[in-house]
């Protein structure tokens, strides 16, 4: 009934606990559920840990793309392999609480997308600033006030998700931010649910200091602007907005 998808990169310290927590709290309690972990060509023992766990947990499906592509591409790779009617996106860094899933899950009957909103960001002022800037950029570029477009805690009806993703270039750096925008523009039923956010307990952060974050922010803004133009004119990989069927 649900495919839980999470990317992982150099998470050997915490990936076993992450998998066991999500399996015990969520996957084992839903008939037919699967846990897809995309090992984004980690340089540590993440892949080996996942391979061992897959022998113990049949619902675990570890996947490894041919090359490292970053968080966004790893998610798209995982989405390509889901088998269930609902898709849940989360991260493997243990900054979210698996039990919060049920608060999201209970909204599915009246929603196509249920999007988590972090109550507070627990990973430092730079990331809080980036979230604020992203919120303002979405308003300026798209005319939408989205509280937490990049929160990695989203439940999506698979059929609707696929119709949104086809409009997002596969090499997008921020596919889930754009998905948060397009599902509203395409007039799907969207619900927001406040969820907890914890400090990272281990593993490796994918992004570094302030200078790198500034470059990331600039790249995100360029992609938002470029996609806005592409969608407006119906060019490239993205179709014009307006018909979600």
List each model region and its residues:
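Short active-site alpha-helical segment characteristic of glycosyltransferases
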Residues: 96, 175-182
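A conserved acidic beta->alpha catalytic loop
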Residues: 39-48, 94
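Short, well-formed alpha-helical segments that are part of the catalytic scaffolds
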Residues: 11-26
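Cell-envelope/extracellular polymer assembly enzymes that use nucleotide-activated donors
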Residues: 1-3, 34, 178
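Catalytic donor-sugar/metal-binding loop of nucleotide-sugar-dependent glycosyltransferases
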Residues: 168-171, 180-198
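Acidic helix N-cap motif at the loop->helix transition within catalytic regions
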Residues: 13-17, 44-53
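Conserved donor nucleotide-binding strand/loop of the catalytic core
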Residues: 33-36, 47-81
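Acceptor/aglycone-binding surface of glycosyltransferases and processive sugar-polymer synthases
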Residues: 65-81, 86-88, 95-173, 200-221, ...
């Amino acid at each position: 009934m649900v495919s839980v998808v999470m990317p992982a990169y150099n998470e050997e310290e915490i990936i076993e606990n992450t998998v066991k927590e999500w399996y015990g709290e969520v996957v084992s309690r839903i008939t037919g559920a699967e846990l897809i972990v995309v090992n984004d060509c980690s340089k540590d023992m993440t892949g080996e840990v996942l391979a061992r766990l897959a022998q113990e947990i049949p619902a675990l499906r570890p996947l490894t793309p041919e090359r490292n592509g970053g968080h966004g591409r790893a998610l798209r790779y995982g989405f390509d392999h889901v088998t269930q009617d609902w898709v849940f996106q989360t991260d493997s860094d243990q900054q979210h609480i698996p039990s919060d899933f049920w608060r999201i899950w209970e909204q599915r009957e009246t929603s196509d997308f249920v999007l988590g909103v972090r109550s507070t960001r627990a990973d430092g002022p730079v990331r809080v600033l980036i979230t604020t800037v992203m919120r303002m950029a979405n308003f300026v570029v798209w005319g939408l006030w989205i509280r937490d477009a990049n929160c990695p805690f989203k439940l999506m009806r698979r059929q609707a998700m696929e119709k949104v993703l086809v409009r997002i270039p596969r090499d997008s750096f921020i596919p889930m931010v754009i998905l948060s925008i397009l599902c509203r523009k395409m007039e799907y039923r969207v619900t927001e649910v406040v969820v907890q956010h914890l400090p990272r307990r281990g593993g490796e952060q994918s992004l570094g200091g302030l200078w790198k974050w500034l470059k990331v922010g600039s790249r995100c803004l360029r992609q938002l602007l470029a996609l806005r133009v592409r969608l407006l004119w119906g060019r490239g990989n993205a179709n014009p907005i307006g018909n979600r069927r």
